[in-house]
Amino acid sequence: MSLFDRPATASVLYDVPGPKARARYRLFGILSLLGVAGLLWYVIATLADNGQFDADLWDPFQYNAVQQMIVDGLLSTLKAFGLAAALSLTLGALLATGQLSDHRPVRWTCTAVVQFFRAMPLLILIVALYYAFFAKDPMWALVLGLTLYNGSVQAEIIRSGVNAVARGQGEAAYALGMRKSQVMSSILVPQAVRSMLPSMIGQLVVTLKDTSLGYIITYNELLFMGKKIASQPLNAAGFPYIPVVLVIGPIYIALCLLLTALARWIEARGRRGANRRTSAAA
Amino acid sequence: MRTSRTLAVALCAVALTATAACGKDGSPGGSAASSASNAPALPTYTVKTDVKVDSPVIAEAKKRGQLIIGAKADQPFLGWEDVASGDRSGFDIEIAKMIAADLGFTPQQIKWQTLVSSQREPAIAKGQIDFYVGTYSINDERKKTVSFAGPYYIAGQDLLVKNDNTSITGPESVSGKNVCTATGSTSIKNIQQYNPKITQFDTYSACVEKLLSGEVDAVTTDDAILKGYASKYAGKLKVVGKPFTKENYGVGLNKDDKTLRDAISDALKAHEDNGDWKKAYDATLGLSGSAAPAVPTLERY
Amino acid sequence: MGFLFEQDNFALFRDGFLQTIELSALSALLALLLGTLLAAFRVSPVPILRAFGTTWVTLFRNTPLTLLFFAVTFGLPPLGVHFSHLVFAVLALGGYTASFVCEVIRSGINTVPLGQAEAARSLGMSFGQTLTLVVLPQATRTVLAPMSSVFIALPRNSAIAGAFSVPELYSAQQTFSERGYSIFAIFFWVACAYLLISATIATLFRFLETRLAVAR
């Protein structure tokens, strides 16, 4: 029962609970635990009644060919993600440079591009690219779509990161006689990177998740394979949509959590290097 | 950063291949179109050598040593792919193999590409596939973007309902009912005039799942497709049996490639005349219980 | 470009546009309510509620939206939950966006000066009162900017519903390309529609920002 007894001290929103409050929290805790457990039990029981856990429905997953499909799908997902990540970071850096340019036409063009692709649904962008240019090679429609959209978002992240560096830093550098490119590359960007990294990696998580849209344009990624397994059942027990979601979902979640863990690790390292005061958590 | 991601990827791959090491090969007996022991055998086709078809698509295919054929993968007895073995089977698949043989390609030289209904036109027009065989109804609107060889089969739109459903007896009785069909199919337009509530997914299998779970009252499309599902889920689903349209199935190919169209028409004609068509029908669609219809007359243009 | 005014194309486009707006508005409402509730869970003194909030956010933020749509569309009916496909889409999109809203609000709560909550508590306010009367109203201001990106992303994400039997703009696009119109012309009109929606939301948030900034 340690979960209920642990005193809640970490927050400024409430006092350290006294004996009465602790009893009340424990009651709340037990009630909500019962509620959640009840709901979970209902879901599992109904699904079981429905035959969703019958061996027949899970049958596909024991075949080599099906397991190979999932591995291939995973690799295709990672391949598209790798390409899109590299390209979108490059495009983001270019667009951000453009947006921070002193030349008005360059600045306006880049801002327009960024705003346009940030507003377009990725799905529509990918499908349009597929129909118009890449019907032979759906992977590039997916990668290019992801690049255009995520590159625009990365550009915004970089731009606001650079703008968030204290103004005096840039002014001091100019006063020392540095040129704009020097100010950017040796003063502003190095300082901005530290604060930008978490959001940039957060956006990479979004990129990873969005590779799943490839299924709509016949790119053989993980979700495409999952859908294939679900819609071509081996026996007459029904379509294994729920088993497929239960298998594919955790794979995506694990991949995203790995990326997020990476983000957190980098953030922690950055904080250590900067000698920053640790802020009080609420 | 680089190393830890590579490590993560490697770990995932290892975890998956490790589980993969204890899997089964092959596919379970009695899957959709593989059949009982006394079932009619599939015909085999003699692969022609020395084929001269002056078509850019075929020239390209010869060069790559592979013919890329688009097909459906989730329609029992028509276009089916067994996920456990990777084998394709069904009437459309047989038709595609016949044509491939006459164009000089062995079944091993065929690369199948699964495409759902709404993806067919762009894939053909842009050359993602060489041609498409998969319950593709010939109509004038589609002839604007692709061309057709055939028809090689005539189907009619019908309704698939649950076995105990007595209220849906034909298209007139679907008004206000929830009817499911596939995006990008001709079936939508045909059923719309009867005022049902329409649900759309990209595949018919999603519709059948929705019918089995009671979300929709009926699935509508060509009877050939529906019969396959009805016999796969015998005892749960039935076909109403009142076709209300005529759908001419054709082989879809590049709009301007008349040479290829003629070659495919010749191939169809030859196999219809030598009895392969009938044998293929008996070994696939015939298993769903309906006798072979008359061979349709080819329309050449 | 002129194809939009042929046949019944304009009606189809208009219906798709309205459906996109309806879907986005309903999902936004669900996301806002659920997201605030989850944020309250995540800062609450009851450990189980905190764990529930954290689990929800972890699950929904890290699952592709398309997979969530699959889970809702094909997973709920076997549980005896039968709704129209619009409601399914609202559940998937709303539940997904709620996890983002929750994180934005939570980080907003963290920016409210410590003294505010301490003062509220020393006046004898309970956790609920501290949160709803003192902390959240102040957090609203700081969360507006990140919140606007979440809600601009929402109509964009709603396009996925088109593949799950909701007749919105994406499915109108599909129908148009089946009718054989040029993909560039179709893309032009659909792009205009989405730009209009996102510009409207951006303007709305900018208006809110100026309104609330005065109060500070």
Predicted features, each with a name:
Chain B
Residues T19-A33:
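Bacterial lipoprotein signal-peptidase II cleavage site
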Residues G23, N38-K52, S185, V251-G289:
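Extended ligand-binding regions for polar small-molecule ligands
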Residues A32-L42, V47-Y132:
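Extracytoplasmic small-molecule ligand-binding "clamshell" domains
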Residues R88-L103, Y136-S137, A155-V208, D223-K227:
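Bilobed "Venus flytrap"/periplasmic-binding protein-like clamshell domains
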Residues I110-P122, T166-S167, T183, T199-S213, ...:
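Short helix-initiation/N-cap motifs at beta->coil->alpha
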Residues Q119, T135-K144, L212, D217-K246:
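A ligand-binding cleft/hinge motif common to bilobed small-molecule-binding domains
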